[in-house]
A protein has these predicted regions:
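Alpha/beta catalytic cores of group-transfer enzymes, especially the acyltransferase/condensing modules
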Residues: 77-78, 169-324
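Charged catalytic carboxylate motif
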Residues: 134, 284, 329
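A generic local structural motif
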Residues: 57-60, 143, 187-188, 230-232, ...
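A short, acidic, amphipathic alpha-helical segment used as a generic capping/interface helix at domain edges
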Residues: 325-344
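Conserved strand-to-helix beginnings and helix N-cap segments that scaffold or border functional pockets
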Residues: 82-85, 125, 249, 278-282, ...
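N-terminal cationic-hydrophobic initiation segments that often serve targeting/anchoring roles
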Residues: 143, 257, 293, 338-341
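FabD-like malonyl-/acyl-CoA
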Residues: 2-13, 17, 23-217, 345-389
Length: 389
């Protein structure tokens, strides 16, 4: 595939650094040969390494129009639905992933995704691995339908657990190892959620809304009820005037108007994710990540913790753990991904996986970037463009 040699896949100082191994680790299994409609990602990366020297690749990148690059966004928990990945088993890579997932997880993830029941799929311990695998299955679909999109990818970001999928796609983590880490993370977060009754409240506020003050008053109210060390804090920054507040939330629900909240809706999750109530999940995840081989990503991957690019393997290990108890800075991440000089064209953006929430958020963060947005569903549906909020 001649076009692949010019792809800016190895940005970020990754040129010539074991690219084939990174791509092979990405999927964690042997892959079909050249008889398929599109080459596998391992094949593509091997072609890239063999066909082009680093200096030539750099020169080509300098001449490349910014819009020719692509950005992939990976969704998080809450995007799952019964029936996702239906029909994707036609792709050998997807079949490989689900076969391996069953061995890693100890249960039939594909059947759970296709048939439910919904209550079981929505449990944190199940939906995080489900979204992780479904997102990478959507990448496999994209690679068969539009391989040039994958070839030209220059950056990736994932929302919460979606960050693991982004790092697998970028060659920093192996598929099986990352899935096991997601399993441990999900089970630990489920257990932490059950230990302390709590929740998450999605809020769209007016300009005068003061989220910190609202959270402070909510904590004081909890203390007056005898709750020790109550938690109520912003856990997700979605887009301007939209936040997710997590912790002990009844007071905020009952007093939404007082704090200039236009809309306040409880999310169907089991606990206060990305707050200190998730501290019991930190050590189990940290121990797993210590045992996993992590490499520098083959393209730019942005962290939820600070909205900046991952720099090296230790950086990834540290921030993936910190992310569990830190707010998701998604709005800030979108600004980092799409920051560019005035007049520079925006890249094509593909949300890969179930749901289109990240596209809706992107529209609110950066309308110009959203105009180049497409959604790659985790079913056999066609690729959809510009999903409206």
């Amino acid at each position: 595939m001649g076009g692949w040699a010019a792809a800016p896949w190895r940005l970020g100082g990754c040129s010539g650094r074991g690219g084939l191994r990174g791509a092979a680790r990405r999927w964690g299994s042997s892959r079909p040969g050249a008889g398929d409609r599109a080459a596998t990602l391992s094949d593509l990366l091997q072609t890239s390494v063999e066909a082009e020297e680093p200096d030539a690749a750099a020169a080509r990148r300098e001449r490349r129009c910014p819009r020719e690059g692509t950005v992939l966004l990976f969704p998080g928990q809450g995007s799952q639905f019964v029936g996702m990945c239906r029909g994707l088993q036609r792709y050998p890579g997807v079949r490989d992933m689900y076969r391996l997932a069953e061995k890693v997880l100890g249960y039939d993830l594909l059947s759970l995704c296709l048939e439910g029941p919904r209550d079981a799929l929505d449990r944190t311990q199940h939906c995080q691995p489900a979204v992780f695998v479904a997102s990478l299955a959507a990448v496999e679909k994209l690679n068969h339908l539009q391989p040039e999109v994958v070839e030209r990818c220059v950056a990736a970001a994932g929302y919460s657990v979606g960050e693991f999928a982004a790092l697998v796609f970028a060659g920093a983590l192996g598929f099986a190892e990352a899935l096991y880490a997601v399993k441990v993370r999900a089970e630990a977060m489920q257990k932490a959620s059950e230990a302390v009754p709590s929740g998450m409240l999605s809020v769209v506020g007016r300009r005068e809304a003061n989220y910190k003050f609202a959270c402070l008053e909510a904590r004081k109210h909890c203390e007056s009820l005898g709750i020790e060390n109550p938690v109520c804090t912003v856990s997700n920054y979605l887009f301007p005037d939209s936040r997710v507040i997590a912790g002990h939330l009844q007071f905020l629900q009952e007093n939404a108007r007082k704090y200039y909240f236009k809309r306040a809706k409880m999310l169907p999750v089991s606990g206060a994710f990305h707050t200190r109530l998730m501290e019991p999940a930190v050590e189990p995840l940290a121990e797993v990540l210590k045992s996993i081989e992590i490499q520098k990503p083959l393209l730019c991957v942005y962290s939820n913790v600070d909205g900046k690019k991952y720099m090296h393997s230790k950086h990834i290990q540290k921030l993936l753990v910190k992310q569990v108890v830190s707010p998701v800075l998604w709005e800030q991440t979108m600004h980092s991904v799409y920051e560019r000089k005035q007049g520079t064209e925006f890249p094509y953006t593909y949300e890969v996986g179930p749901g289109n929430q990240l596209g809706a958020i992107l529209k609110q963060c950066n309308l110009k970037a959203w105009k180049q947005y497409k959604h790659v569903d985790s079913t056999m549906c066609i690729i959809a463009m510009n999903i409206f909020f």
